[in-house]
Structure formats: structure tokens, C-alpha cells
Amino acid sequence: MDRASELLFYVNGRKVIEKNVDPETMLLPYLRKKLRLTGTKYGCGGGGCGACTVMISRYNPITKRIRHHPANACLIPICSLYGAAVTTVEGIGSTHTRIHPVQERIAKCHGTQCGFCTPGMVMSIYTLLRNHPEPTLDQLTDALGGNLCRCTGYRPIIDACKTFCKTSGCCQSKENGVCCLDQGINGLPEFEEGSKTSPKLFAEEEFLPLDPTQELIFPPELMIMAEKQSQRTRVFGSERMMWFSPVTLKELLEFKFKYPQAPVIMGNTSVGPEVKFKGVFHPVIISPDRIEELSVVNHAYNGLTLGAGLSLAQVKDILADVVQKLPEEKTQMYHALLKHLGTLAGSQIRNMASLGGHIISRHPDSDLNPILAVGNCTLNLLSKEGKRQIPLNEQFLSKCPNADLKPQEILVSVNIPYSRKWEFVSAFRQAQRQENALAIVNSGMRVFFGEGDGIIRELCISYGGVGPATICAKNSCQKLIGRHWNEQMLDIACRLILNEVSLLGSAPGGKVEFKRTLIISFLFKFYLEVSQILKKMDPVHYPSLADKYESALEDLHSKHHCSTLKYQNIGPKQHPEDPIGHPIMHLSGVKHATGEAIYCDDMPLVDQELFLTFVTSSRAHAKIVSIDLSEALSMPGVVDIMTAEHLSDVNSFCFFTEAEKFLATDKVFCVGQLVCAVLADSEVQAKRAAKRVKIVYQDLEPLILTIEESIQHNSSFKPERKLEYGNVDEAFKVVDQILEGEIHMGGQEHFYMETQSMLVVPKGEDQEMDVYVSTQFPKYIQDIVASTLKLPANKVMCHVRRVGGAFGGKVLKTGIIAAVTAFAANKHGRAVRCVLERGEDMLITGGRHPYLGKYKAGFMNDGRILALDMEHYSNAGASLDESLFVIEMGLLKMDNAYKFPNLRCRGWACRTNLPSNTAFRGFGFPQAALITESCITEVAAKCGLSPEKVRIINMYKEIDQTPYKQEINAKNLIQCWRECMAMSSYSLRKVAVEKFNAENYWKKKGLAMVPLKFPVGLGSRAAGQAAALVHIYLDGSVLVTHGGIEMGQGVHTKMIQVVSRELRMPMSNVHLRGTSTETVPNANISGGSVVADLNGLAVKDACQTLLKRLEPIISKNPKGTWKDWAQTAFDESINLSAVGYFRGYESDMNWEKGEGQPFEYFVYGAACSEVEIDCLTGDHKNIRTDIVMDVGCSINPAIDIGQIEGAFIQGMGLYTIEELNYSPQGILHTRGPDQYKIPAICDMPTELHIALLPPSQNSNTLYSSKGLGESGVFLGCSVFFAIHDAVSAARQERGLHGPLTLNSPLTPEKIRMACEDKFTKMIPRDEPGSYVPWNVPI
């Protein structure tokens, strides 16, 4: 055997040769650390977010074609890249050379905010264009299905990509065949004045053309290598692992005989996550990526044979081609497989994962195995002993020894038979999110009838997600043989299958009753599908489906999206070069798109740098009996392990009223609490050592996880907050009706794309320390680090260039991590880097507070609410953090848009044994307002009115007073409501929804509209201070720094717009480097929607100071340039630097009196959403959303609209699909994108229309603008209440007329189980207390 151990591949056109390759090295760290190509980002490490997307290209010497495909660099072992060409975002374009059209368009179409996900987005689209220069919208959405974005809401990204499509900008999906952009801007009414409608915020005609001839060519050397068919086996090894890549089938069998336990990997999408997340280790890996026999495609007389080495994407293309060429009766299996291949994972994973690997892995929630299991498929196996064929059946899927592969065998190919006439195959799945999400339950079903008699001859039904393996209901199917296909058979089948496919109440994954319901709901769908086909085949003998049932068979989800935007006109008196009010591109947009934007972990390694990782508690409430560090300390590369004992008297810091310990001392109070910190010379060694730290615990009582448990144990933080207005008790005596209710609202993970990251560098002189950190609050980082090191603050400088998303989650916990990291750096005199993995970040940092809201409302029969008594309980977690502030803001904002003449609201932050929850975009308002809106909805139901009528009758009117006695002018609130009513055609569509619901039993539509009043301010003048520093250099260029953090909201862009206006110079003349405590000290936190407000006023002040100094010089030489004026000023000894300062808004709140002026102004808005739900599965589709917002005078409509729609999508996720799951022991189950689902492109509204009200004056703010970062989150609940409306319609048709309270998030499980029917009544129910549930509702 001729062996080679040298690895050769190309990266961005440059040859890479590695002689000593570690098989455990993945491409992502290799690119970032070894090649310093940091454009490719770490987002999750498991192929679930797309941030690390690159293009892999290979030449096939047989077809003479080059195949380009997207791939997740975090899962690709570099050993698998021999002979491949890797292209990263740096390789397609750069600001130093030329940017690629993809990079240009995604930037100029405002498709970047924080920019962290952008390189992955760019590479997914770039790869698509390499294969399809003029893609369809279907191809476009498929290509982006594996990429997540937490900021933009996806609309601008889709708009950018549409410019490459065959019919650019067209929605391509309207029922009448007319694009939405050609329908008079979708028929949206124009406002009277001050605004204009545009489908885009960019000029398409200015874009660079896409020219395929200018792309990087595939390296000729690799083509020659491939043509030579080198017969050298590749062997790579390290101390821990060997990697074998055979070149022939015979050699593969020899390796498998020699190493029978070694996994055979193609794409590493199954083995890779097991190694990373489950700690599985394989000393030998076999990679047969060059063996032709594994990529066979054979069309035989009885079916199709597909090689086990084919990627799922290749299988999808092959099957799509087959179904085009063969009659439908032969391709039933292939249609079913295609249905699931379209939603299975993302494009990257589908291009990496192999068919054989997917089958052999036998994951219990596999989407393909249930279909293959019912289709009489067989597996062709091979070993040194010879060939063997086994059926792909339940015995194989459950790994029965006599039906499984032998250790020395490999899977060569799969036989998938053609279907026959009178044979029907279908596939079903339901997931938390429709694409790139593991199924909750999936199924494959096949039935074969006698010739035209409707009698079942064969029946096979398999399910995934309901057991440890794919389950086949063979006993039930056998009992149904010989029966007629009718409703009697269906009823018997449901009962048989529920009895056979049984689920324990404690089954992993939870959702047990939902899963039981899906089992028979899918069967009913199959029954309807087959019945419909039978009717078409033989109209005489088979009855038609009832018209009301036909919609049950229609697919909910559309891949086509259209949008219109309406933003403000620029006044005729404004100078043409004044950028204020123009849709200016995010000034880092191009750098985001080229990968040149530097984030914290992109900074180069410092000499002798160490890496720090944490060991966290595995118990929720326990005493630490002992910590054994000996084995971990003895490992190679480990420098130190620090515990609370090392930090001693600096192991805590008090920011609010309660100090929080950095590292646990004698007790732990939640799973995920920091216990000790491991310091090593590499990230790999630090993480390996952390796993060897042994901690012995002794559990303590009580274990408090839920709000109800905290109430029971009187466990809450002090003080209780209370807000009272009017006389509630007296008002209850005079109302017509009184109702009481409660609603639970789950928490939310920030899921910023860039995890917690920092690099602390000792300067080696005067004890100075530089802290580079991804944070919203540099001053706090400076203070906590200085306190920990017992240094004055002037020795510690904190630097933040940009943050890859934050949403409130990069403040207090970031400070604790930074303090420990700085302590380690100071102790050892070496730079220390700390970057949390996604799972660590989700476990440690907490998120949005879960809420329990209780309400008692007194109201008149016309819907007027005269008395409201509310109680808010938040699940604060184990420490105070910012929970009291969240409760306060929730109470102050709970009235939303409504005037309640008599109001009492109390709030408690509940202490529990969960990681501390913290600030999150909206800061208590999304929870508090949902409670209020739920009460409104229930009042409407009691009065027999629509919720919208009750909303408008209780809404603030013109000048009024809030419960805390602050004056409010609600004119723009009413205008937003009216404009949204008109823009959405609410009245007409409400009639259409009711008509649809009357005609359809299993699908229902809902329509809901909600108003928004969002107070903006931080509650005190001190919190609203801001400063800025502006320098003018002698060449006329300007450098501006300020205290705000750029975290995607475009604050730096707006600040440069301010400088441009105030100094009357082009924006290109102004530069902004980042934020540092060295240049702007004592800056407040960036949050609360006021970052641009406050810092903009400080920048404006600095500029006006400079302009006042320079006015005499400018007036003497009005035609001069800034270079002339700066030089003259210098010659005359005039200071060309100025500090700007803003004292903060006049704001205060007296909680003892329950009154004050805590806010500077109010943002108003309204949103209307229409949804369609599938009553059988709980699935939903957002058909259309219309949003109208009052933004004052927009500084930058592109950025402002981006904030509105990004917040809306994040809020939609909060209220619908984002679900945190904790075990009864307090362990977080949802620790990554595989388990926790944020909205993806498939969740976008099919139609999205956003309008800004005409300009309105607001004298105290920056150019009369308003901060919009947080307010739009709440508008996502328009989707929640539209679903509520649809569920109500379903329940009423089923005779369920009682009160309906739906908790948030309104997941598929809750939707389905609320749509009660004969199937939900049929399932068995477990008695509470008779089992230990998998998860506990928090």
C-alpha cells in the first residue's frame, strides 16, 4: 500500500501544504488561527447557524465537472480537504482590491446590522451563484435556509439576493400572477404628506454586474491531480487519532476489517457533533471520499440504486430529475423523500451529509429513515467476507443484531424501488421551525390497494421522534390488511396505532401529548391524501372529500416574499449634501460583507497568550463538598486553575444593590454557575482539562425553579414594586362585569451571533491593562476589572470596536467573565483570551425573564375597562442582576396604549435556582404588554366584541396622563392605528378571513392588530449623560469618538451623519474608530433605545463648539476647504479638538409616591398580522404583516426600518417558536441552534409592509428623531394574537365557546392542543405526578 501523509489543498487560490496534520483539527480554527482568515466566523460549532459557511470546490475526473457547494467550516476536518479548493469570504472580494457583487449588494441593500452573520450569508449566496448565475427565488431561499441572522429580520438580505434572480425584485408567487410591486405598491394608501413609498431603499441600477468570468478559477494543479487518479492512500495521525483515506473499495474493506469500530465518515455531520458536544472519541477515522463505487447512480427496471456516499443534496437533485422523467405512479417514494429533503437541515449540511451516513446513524428523529422503512428499501452491504443485502426495516433501525451491519461491513448503496399503480406513499413532519429544525414527529406511510377495489393489500407506517429509534407500527398495519379505505378503517387505525406506538409521560424531548396527537393527525392527513387521489383515479366508486376538508392537504409555507417600505420625504429646504434623513448604508456594511470587520476574537494572537475556560456547576442547589484539580493540572499545556479561594476578597462586585460572586465558594445556586477557571496554552487543552476537574456536590433543599414554587416558598428579591392610579376597589363596584385570569410567558435566549468574547492584555508597565471585549458597557468592565485587580480605573482601559449582537446580554455577566479573565492575566503576566462556546454562553448568561401575569379587570358591556388590578412575577434566577429594573420598567410600561382610569399593578422579581436572567431588548415591556393585551382580548370575548374594538375604545386620546402622572400626547398613536387599519385593509381582510374559516375546517386564518406606546428613557438624568470627542486634523479630516457601542443598530453611521451635518462636510471626510474608556470616560451603558439620542447630542455639541471657534476663519475664506480652514486655525493657535457633552434628559421616578417623569418621549406604532394555522399539526404561516411607526424625524430611514423589522422578527420568535426547556433538576436542555429555534428565513411574513409616519417635531431629541431599538419587539405579538384569533375560530366551530387563554410562546404544540378535536380526545393522558417529566415549564 502506497501511503502519503502530506495534505495539499487550496484556500482562496493559494496552495496549502501541511506535513503534520492533526486529524482532530477542523477547518474553522485552521482558517482563523493558522491562516488568519477571520472573516469566517464561529457561531455555534455544530453546523446550525451558517456563520462559518465557506465554499468547497472539487473536480470530478469522470464527469469533467467542478462541483461547488457550501459547507460549515466548523464541521469539516481539514484531513478531508485533500485535493479540494476552499473559498472564504476574503477570497471573493476585498476593499483593497474589488468587492464582489454579492458583497456590494448585501451591504448597499442594508442587509447587515451587527454584521457577524454576513460573511456566512455572502458565501451561501456566492456558492449558489457559482452554480446558478440567475437563480430562482426557490433556489435562493433554499440556499439561505442554513443561515441565521438575529438582527435584520432577513427582509433586506432577501431584497439584496433578489437582484440576482431571473425576475429581480418580483415575488413570483402571487395568485393572480402579478408581482406585488406592480400592484400600485400593493395598493397601500399614501399618507397625506411627508412620506413616500418605495419598494427598496437602494438604487439597483448602480450595482456592479455579476460577471462569472471574473471569478476565482479552480486550481489547474488540482484538476491534474484528480485526472492522474493517484492511488496513494492518505494517512494522517497525531498522538490521539489516526485518519485513513483509502482510494479503492478493497482497501476500504481492509481498513474496516482491521478497525471494525472505526466510523466511516463522509461529511462529518453526525460524528462531528457527537465528538464536540457528547465527548465521544474515536481513535481511528476512515474517510472513503474518493471511492467511486460509493457514488453510484443506477436506474434499474425495478427502481433506483443510490450510492451511500452521495450527499443528500446530490440525492435531492437526482430524485428531482427522476420524478420529472417518470410517470407519477412510479415515483411516489421519490416525491415523499423530496418533500423531506427540502426541509432537512440547511443547504450546507445537505451538501456535506451523505445518504449512507444519514441512514446508518439511525437518529430517532431522522427525516428519511421513516420513509425508506415503509418503501421496501434494501441496503447493499460489503465486507471482506463478501456481499450481503438486508432490508431497511424496523429491526435494522432499532439495531437488532441479526438485522444490522456487522462491524466489518460498510454500506455501499441503497435500493429504492419504484412505486406501483394503486400504491401511495406520503411523508409528514412537524418541527418547531419548518426548515433547518429536527422534527418533533415525522412519519412515512405507504398503502397498496387491490386493482380498483379500495381494499388494503399492504400498509406500512413508520414514525420518528417518538422513541429511541424509528418505530414501525407493523402490528397495527397487519390488522388493517383487507379492510376498505374508509372512515371506519381510519377510526380503528388510530386506536390501534396509539396502542402500539406508545410514549411514556417522561419520554425524552417532552411534548408527549402533542406527539401522540401528531401520530394520528398524520394518519388522518394520509387518509385524506389517499382518498383524494382515489377519487381522481376512480370518481365513480370513491366519494369526494368534503370541501371543508380539502385545505388540510395544502402546504402552508411559501418560499416567496415581497415587501414595500414607506419612508419620509426630505424637506425641500434641506441642503442636498446634508445626509440627515437619507437611507445611508451602514458604514461598516461593506467590511461586514468582505469579512474585514474585526470582532473581538478576530484580533491576532498575542505572544504567549493563554486561553481561559470555565468549569460550571452541574447542580442547581448544592453544597460543594470538594474540588479535585489534580488530574486537570497534570495535563499538558495547563498553566493554572483558579477557584474562589484564589480570588479571595475580590471575588465579587456590587453594581446594583446586591453583590454577585464571580466564582462559587461553598454553595452553588444554579446549573451553569461559574465554579473555577482553567488556564492553558491553547483553547483545546483548556477545554480538555476542564472536563477533568472533579467536583463533589451535596444537594440542598429547596430546589426552586418555577415562579409558582418561588411564591410558595416566599422567595423573591426586595423590594416589591407597586404602581397605583385612581381608586381600583371603588371602580370594581360600578362595572358591568369582572373577569380574572392569568398568562404565562416563557423566557428568551439573546442568541447574539457573536458569543461572549474578550482578550485581556497586560501592558507590562505601571500595571496597565488593556481589555478588548464584546460589551455594551465599557465603563462597567473598566470598573469591575479595576476593582478585581485593586487598581485605579486609569490603569485599566476597555476597548470595543464593534459587537456582534448584544440585545442586553453583554453587560453584567460579561463583566464577571472579564474580571476573572483579567485576574488570570494579571496573575501570570500574560495575555488571556476567553471566548464562550454557544452552549456555554446559553447555559451561563441567562436571558429574558419568564413572566407570570395575573389580572382582574372590571369593565362595562361596551368594552371600556374601568378597573384593572395586575400582578407581575418574573423569574429572576439565582441573583438579582437587572431583574428589579426589569420589573420597574414592566410596571411603568404595562398600560401600553391604553388609559385605565383605575389601575393597580404590583411586581416581584422571584429568586429561583436558575441562571440569573438579565436585560433583554424591551426590558420587561414585551412581557408586561402581552399580559395587558391578553386581558384586553379576554374582555373583548366576554363582551362579544372584536379585540380591535376594545383596544380603540380604551386607547389614549390626544393629551392625557399616564398612571405615573407623566403627560402624554397620543395624537400620533391614533394616527398610527388609523394608518395601519387603512394600509392593511383590515376591515376587508377581516371579512375574507371569516369567509375562509367558514369554508375550511382543518385550516384557519386569524387577523389581529395591536397598538404600541413605548416610553423611551432610562429613568434618571445620570443614566442619560453622554460625551464625545471630535478632532479636526490639518488635512481637514475628522475623527469622532463617543460613548456609544456599535452593536448593529448603526449608531456609528448616525454619528458620522451628525458630524457631516454640523460641520457641513461630506461623510467620507469623517472617521470613527470605535469606543474606548481611554477617549470617552465614564460613558453609560448602550441600551434603552437612547444610544443615538444621547451620544448624537454630545457629538452635535462638540461639532458646534468647533464650528463656533472656526466661524471667523470660515467667514473670511468661505470658498476655502476644510484643509485650508484647519491649517489657518492651527496657525492661529485655535484648538481643533472639542469635547461634547449632554447632561441627560430631565427624568426621575419616585416609587414611594408612584409618580414621576421617567421618560423623555414615547414611540408609537401599530402592527397588523394575518396568519394561517394547520389545526392538525399546530403549524402556522405568517401571511402578511403591516407596521406603521412614528419615528419623529428619521435620521436614517434604512437603519430605522432595519431596527423596526429586526425587532419585529425577534419579537415574533419570542411569542411563537423560541422555547427554553429545563429539566426538573434545573438543567437547560436547549443549548444551541439544534435545540433552540430562532426565526429563520422560512419564518418571514410572505408579505411585509412597513411605513413611517410623516415627520413630527420633538424639540428635545436629536433632530426630532426617536430611538427605535426596542419598541418593535412587542409588535411581534400581533402574530401571537392572530394565531389566537385562528385558534378561537377553530374552537368555536368545534363547539368550544369558553374562555381561551394561550400562553407564550405559542408553539406548534400549544396551537395543536388548543384546537381540540376527536384526535386530541382519542389520545391517552398521563396522570400528573405519575411520572417525572422531561422538562418543567419555567
UniProtKB/Swiss-Prot annotation:
<feature type="modified residue" description="Phosphoserine">
    <location>
        <position position="1068"/>
    </location>
</feature>
<feature type="binding site">
    <location>
        <position position="358"/>
    </location>
    <ligand>
        <name>FAD</name>
    </ligand>
</feature>
<keyword id="KW-0443">Lipid metabolism</keyword>
<feature type="binding site">
    <location>
        <position position="354"/>
    </location>
    <ligand>
        <name>FAD</name>
    </ligand>
</feature>
<feature type="binding site">
    <location>
        <begin position="264"/>
        <end position="271"/>
    </location>
    <ligand>
        <name>FAD</name>
    </ligand>
</feature>
<feature type="binding site">
    <location>
        <position position="1203"/>
    </location>
    <ligand>
        <name>Mo-molybdopterin</name>
    </ligand>
</feature>
<keyword id="KW-0285">Flavoprotein</keyword>
<dbReference type="InterPro" id="IPR008274">
    <property type="entry name" value="AldOxase/xan_DH_MoCoBD1"/>
</dbReference>
<keyword id="KW-0274">FAD</keyword>
<feature type="binding site">
    <location>
        <position position="151"/>
    </location>
    <ligand>
        <name>Mo-molybdopterin</name>
    </ligand>
</feature>
<comment type="function">
    <text>Oxidase with broad substrate specificity, oxidizing aromatic azaheterocycles, such as N1-methylnicotinamide, N-methylphthalazinium and phthalazine, as well as aldehydes, such as benzaldehyde, retinal, pyridoxal, and vanillin. Plays a key role in the metabolism of xenobiotics and drugs containing aromatic azaheterocyclic substituents. Participates in the bioactivation of prodrugs such as famciclovir, catalyzing the oxidation step from 6-deoxypenciclovir to penciclovir, which is a potent antiviral agent. Is probably involved in the regulation of reactive oxygen species homeostasis.</text>
</comment>
<feature type="binding site">
    <location>
        <begin position="1088"/>
        <end position="1091"/>
    </location>
    <ligand>
        <name>Mo-molybdopterin</name>
    </ligand>
</feature>
<dbReference type="GO" id="GO:0050660">
    <property type="term" value="F:flavin adenine dinucleotide binding"/>
</dbReference>
<keyword id="KW-0408">Iron</keyword>
<dbReference type="InterPro" id="IPR000674">
    <property type="entry name" value="Ald_Oxase/Xan_DH_a/b"/>
</dbReference>
<dbReference type="GO" id="GO:0006805">
    <property type="term" value="P:xenobiotic metabolic process"/>
</dbReference>
<feature type="binding site">
    <location>
        <position position="52"/>
    </location>
    <ligand>
        <name>[2Fe-2S] cluster 1</name>
    </ligand>
</feature>
<dbReference type="InterPro" id="IPR036683">
    <property type="entry name" value="CO_DH_flav_C_dom_sf"/>
</dbReference>
<dbReference type="GO" id="GO:0006629">
    <property type="term" value="P:lipid metabolic process"/>
</dbReference>
<dbReference type="GO" id="GO:0071949">
    <property type="term" value="F:FAD binding"/>
</dbReference>
<dbReference type="GO" id="GO:0043546">
    <property type="term" value="F:molybdopterin cofactor binding"/>
</dbReference>
<feature type="domain" description="FAD-binding PCMH-type">
    <location>
        <begin position="236"/>
        <end position="421"/>
    </location>
</feature>
<keyword id="KW-0597">Phosphoprotein</keyword>
<dbReference type="InterPro" id="IPR036318">
    <property type="entry name" value="FAD-bd_PCMH-like_sf"/>
</dbReference>
<feature type="binding site">
    <location>
        <position position="367"/>
    </location>
    <ligand>
        <name>FAD</name>
    </ligand>
</feature>
<dbReference type="InterPro" id="IPR005107">
    <property type="entry name" value="CO_DH_flav_C"/>
</dbReference>
<dbReference type="InterPro" id="IPR022407">
    <property type="entry name" value="OxRdtase_Mopterin_BS"/>
</dbReference>
<dbReference type="GO" id="GO:0015630">
    <property type="term" value="C:microtubule cytoskeleton"/>
</dbReference>
<dbReference type="GO" id="GO:0004031">
    <property type="term" value="F:aldehyde oxidase activity"/>
</dbReference>
<dbReference type="GO" id="GO:0042802">
    <property type="term" value="F:identical protein binding"/>
</dbReference>
<dbReference type="InterPro" id="IPR002888">
    <property type="entry name" value="2Fe-2S-bd"/>
</dbReference>
<dbReference type="Pfam" id="PF02738">
    <property type="entry name" value="MoCoBD_1"/>
</dbReference>
<dbReference type="Pfam" id="PF00111">
    <property type="entry name" value="Fer2"/>
</dbReference>
<dbReference type="Pfam" id="PF20256">
    <property type="entry name" value="MoCoBD_2"/>
</dbReference>
<dbReference type="InterPro" id="IPR036010">
    <property type="entry name" value="2Fe-2S_ferredoxin-like_sf"/>
</dbReference>
<feature type="active site" description="Proton acceptor; for azaheterocycle hydroxylase activity">
    <location>
        <position position="1270"/>
    </location>
</feature>
<keyword id="KW-0560">Oxidoreductase</keyword>
<dbReference type="InterPro" id="IPR014313">
    <property type="entry name" value="Aldehyde_oxidase"/>
</dbReference>
<feature type="binding site">
    <location>
        <position position="151"/>
    </location>
    <ligand>
        <name>[2Fe-2S] cluster 2</name>
    </ligand>
</feature>
<feature type="binding site">
    <location>
        <position position="49"/>
    </location>
    <ligand>
        <name>[2Fe-2S] cluster 1</name>
    </ligand>
</feature>
<dbReference type="Pfam" id="PF01315">
    <property type="entry name" value="Ald_Xan_dh_C"/>
</dbReference>
<feature type="binding site">
    <location>
        <position position="1268"/>
    </location>
    <ligand>
        <name>Mo-molybdopterin</name>
    </ligand>
</feature>
